[in-house]
Structure formats: structure tokens, C-alpha cells
């Protein structure tokens, strides 16, 4: 069920894949997808020891099973944003290659298309179905990663996505999907992350489960205490952090706190309850 615009709830009409390709695994097909996020024109997915990205759009003009595409075909879609200028596409179970994109045409087009590649069979495709790219590896070596959590932020005019997995160094992606690790020892292994008052807050490290670390203003990777970074300790194991209005709420196993203020000089912890907690934030 989903919320109804007229009030209450309504039954969902169904669902379909947003990306047709299966997320690759690292070493075992039993590995679960442990994180998914939408960032810019891409979809981010985390599985095994790696993080991947892919692009998705919808078909604007139907394709018949008999349409000939042998290097000069076109596929008309809502948008080519996020797709490479040449590459591979998948519609349902059929795969295509293309050699160009036309973002000036309305709707957009993939050009130089060849269909039924990689031993797939030409089939009819109706409008509004998913057109997607293969998954591209954007980060590796994330050994024993658990559930991913994400934070989108913009401190310097550039949109970024920060990912934590509870084990490895947090990783930051810009819109070009270039990865930068946050390697400060106290931050590596953080399970929770939130941007609050232009500081990046990290928590959930297994060796310091009661500790909240925060960066200097407008820099998610600088923890110099003299420049506005610091730590805050609560008297319980942190299970989640979340910004709501002008406060950062800190959920613990048996307690809930909120952080107010705007900088290291006036940050203050206020208890909300000491009798109700949150086992898994």
C-alpha cells in the first residue's frame, strides 16, 4: 500500500525494475544488495565489497520486434542524462549497443543502435518501460561491509554523497562519481552519518558506540579540534542519528537525545527520554 493523495492509503498498482541489469556480486551470488541510493543522474547500489552506479530512463517511442537496428537505429527515450556517450543498453531482456546520444532532440535519442546483441532476441517493447545501462564499478575493497547509510550534502557548491557501512572508511562521491575516503582513524568504521549546521556528524563505530564525532564547518574530512571539530559522548549506545528541523536527534538503545546549537562553541545535548530507546536506527 501507499499514501493516497485523497487521504488514507491505496493499493499499489504494481512495480517494475528501475535498472534491468543485476547488480554484480564480488565472490558469491548469495551476497545481498546492502545499500541503494539515487544521486544526480545515477543509481548507486552496494553489494559485496563493491559500490556500483547505473543510469535509467524510460522508452518514449515503442519498438516493434521486426524493427531493423544494425548500427544505424535510434531509441527514443525521456532523457539520456547519466548515460555514457556510447555503450550498452537493456530493455526487458533484450540488449542493445549504441554509438551516440542526442540530448538536443526532444525527446532524447540513443543513436547508432544495434539490437539483439550478446545472444539476446529481438522483441517488442512498449512505451514507458525501463531503459538502463549496465552497472559500473565505482569503489572496491569494502571488506565485510554491513548495511550502507547515505548523506547528501553541498558545502562548497558541489553536490556530494557520503556513504558509511559500519566497517570501512566512509567514502565521498562527487557528481562525477570520483571516490574519496575519509581515513581519520576515529571515523573509519562509522555506521551512521548526518550533516547538521554545516558539520558532518559520524557515529556508531563499534569500539566507541557512545561517541559522536563531528567535522569542522563545511568540510566532511577535517577533524581539527581547534578549527571547530569535536566529539560528544552520550551515556548509551548510539543506534541512529537524524536531523529534524533545527536539531540533530540521537537515538540510543535506551535513550533519545537531541543536539541543538550551530557550532562547537554552543552545541548542547538535551535528553528527550531516558526510558525509551531505539534498537536499530
What is each of the regions a protein language model found here?
Residues 58, 177, 219, 263-264:
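Short coil turn/linker residues within repeat-based beta-strand modules
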Residues 149-185:
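Hydrophobic or amphipathic alpha-helical targeting/insertion segments
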Residues 58-70, 78-147:
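Small/polar beta-strand repeat architecture
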Residues 141-147, 185-190, 273-279:
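Short coil/turn segments at the loop-to-beta-strand junctions that recur within blades
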Residues 28-30, 144-145, 231-235, 275-281:
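Short glycine-/Asp-/Thr-/Trp-enriched loop segments that recur within the blades
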Residues 54-57, 101-103, 166, 175, ...:
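Inter-blade boundary loops/turns of WD-repeat beta-propellers
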Residues 182, 259-275:
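Blade-edge beta-strand/turn elements of extracellular beta-propeller
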Residues 1-57, 135, 170-172, 186-258:
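N-terminal beta-propeller domains
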Amino acid at each position: 500500500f501507499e499514501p493516497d493523495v485523497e487521504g488514507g492509503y491505496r493499493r499499489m498498482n504494481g512495480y517494475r525494475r528501475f535498472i534491468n541489469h543485476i547488480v554484480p556480486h564480488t565472490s558469491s551470488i548469495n551476497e545481498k544488495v546492502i545499500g541503494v541510493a539515487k544521486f544526480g543522474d545515477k543509481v548507486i547500489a552496494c553489494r559485496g565489497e563493491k559500490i556500483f552506479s547505473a543510469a535509467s530512463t524510460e522508452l518514449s517511442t515503442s519498438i516493434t520486434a521486426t524493427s531493423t537496428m544494425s548500427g544505424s537505429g535510434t531509441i527514443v527515450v525521456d532523457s539520456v542524462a547519466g548515460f555514457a556517450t556510447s555503450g550498452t543498453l537493456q530493455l526487458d531482456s533484450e540488449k542493445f549497443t549504441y554509438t551516440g546520444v542526442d540530448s538536443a532532440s526532444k525527446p532524447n535519442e540513443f543513436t547508432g543502435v544495434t539490437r539483439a546483441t550478446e545472444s539476446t532476441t529481438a522483441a517488442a517493447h512498449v512505451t514507458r518501460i525501463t531503459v538502463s545501462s549496465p552497472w559500473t564499478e565505482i569503489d572496491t575493497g569494502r571488506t565485510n561491509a554491513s548495511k550502507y547509510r547515505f548523506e547528501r550534502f553541498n558545502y562548497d557548491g558541489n553536490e556530494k554523497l557520503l556513504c558509511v557501512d559500519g566497517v570501512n572508511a566512509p567514502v565521498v562521491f562527487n557528481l562525477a562519481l570520483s571516490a574519496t575516503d575519509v581515513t581519520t582513524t576515529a571515523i573509519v568504521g562509522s555506521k551512521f552519518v548526518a550533516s547538521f549546521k554545516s558539520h558532518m556528524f559520524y557515529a556508531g563505530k563499534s569500539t566507541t558506540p557512545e561517541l559522536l564525532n563531528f567535522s569542522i564547518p563545511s568540510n566532511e574530512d577535517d577533524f581539527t579540534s581547534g578549527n571547530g571539530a569535536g566529539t560528544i559522548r552520550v551515556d548509551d549506545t548510539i543506534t541512529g542519528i537524524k536531523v529534524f528541523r533545527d536539531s540533530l536527534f540521537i537515538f540510543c538503545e535506551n535513550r533519545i537525545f537531541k543536539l541543538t546549537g550551530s557550532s562547537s562553541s554552543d552545541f548542547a545535548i538535551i535528553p528527550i527520554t531516558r526510558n525509551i530507546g531505539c534498537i536499530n536506527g
